[in-house]
UniProtKB/Swiss-Prot annotation:
Organism: Mycoplasma genitalium (strain ATCC 33530 / DSM 19775 / NCTC 10195 / G37) (Mycoplasmoides genitalium)
Membrane topology field: Peripheral membrane protein
InterPro entries: ATP_synth_OSCP/delta_N_sf (IPR026015), ATPase_OSCP/d_CS (IPR020781), ATPase_OSCP/dsu (IPR000711)
This protein's UniProt keywords: ATP synthesis, Cell membrane, CF(1), Hydrogen ion transport, Ion transport, Membrane, Transport
Family to which the UniProt record says this protein belongs: Belongs to the ATPase delta chain family.
GO molecular function: proton-transporting ATP synthase activity, rotational mechanism
Summary of subunit composition and partner proteins: F-type ATPases have 2 components, F(1) - the catalytic core - and F(0) - the membrane proton channel. F(1) has five subunits: alpha(3), beta(3), gamma(1), delta(1), epsilon(1). F(0) has three main subunits: a(1), b(2) and c(10-14). The alpha and beta chains form an alternating ring which encloses part of the gamma chain. F(1) is attached to F(0) by a central stalk formed by the gamma and epsilon chains, while a peripheral stalk is formed by the delta and b chains.
UniProt xrefs under PROSITE patterns: ATPASE_DELTA
Record's GO cellular component terms: plasma membrane; proton-transporting ATP synthase complex
Entry protein name: ATP synthase subunit delta
Gene Ontology biological-process annotations: proton motive force-driven ATP synthesis
Presence of the UniProt keyword Transport in the record: yes
């Protein structure tokens, strides 16, 4: 029986062979974010649909992802579709994250702020995260002016957030 762990482990092994672990890790995060942007589940529904043939789904994957993701990740999506297990894609990616973080003894994080951080601020954040995760941290920064002020730190398994936008959402939810 095929399971998500087997797909996740296979993706990890391929990414290691191709020396693209970090790139595929980032692409997996982007892909999951993309899947969540389809709030109605339409992308997942389409790729799990019985109305489309497997060759149609493969063409769709090529059309949607080939120019935006590395070939290893696109091939991973194709294999999981051809085997008829696209419903497991999110779980498989989570197993991939687990493999990367445990095998490489690193934690990937994305630091999102409303403004650019100084190297001193960045070093302080990294030191805090390494202490918290008890492992080496590899990071990527991003600026999101909609945060207004504050910070958001994302990893595969944690979310740390303290910003004005988040506070405003909580206040508005209280009144609605």
């Amino acid at each position: 029986m095929i399971n998500a762990q087997a797909f996740g482990t296979a993706l990890f092994q391929l990414s290691e062979e191709q020396k693209q672990v970090k790139k595929i890790y980032e692409e997996c995060h982007f892909f999951l974010k993309l899947m969540r942007n389809f709030k109605d589940g339409s992308l997942s529904f389409l790729l799990n649909s019985y109305t489309l043939t497997k060759p149609d789904k493969i063409r769709l994957v090529d059309k949607l992802f080939k120019n935006h993701f590395c070939q290893v990740f696109v091939d991973f999506l194709k294999v999981i579709i051809l085997k008829g297990y696209f419903t497991l894609v999110e779980q498989a990616i989570k197993y991939f994250f687990d493999n990367v973080e445990s095998q490489k003894h690193i934690q990937f994080i994305k630091i999102i702020t409303a403004f650019e951080l100084s190297s001193k601020q960045l070093n302080k954040i990294i030191a805090i995260m390494e202490k918290r995760f008890k492992t080496k941290v590899v990071y990527k920064t991003e600026i999101d002016r909609s945060l207004i002020s504050g910070i958001r730190i994302e990893s595969s398994s944690h979310l740390f957030e303290k910003n004005v936008r988040d506070e405003l959402k909580r206040i508005m939810a209280h009144f609605i």
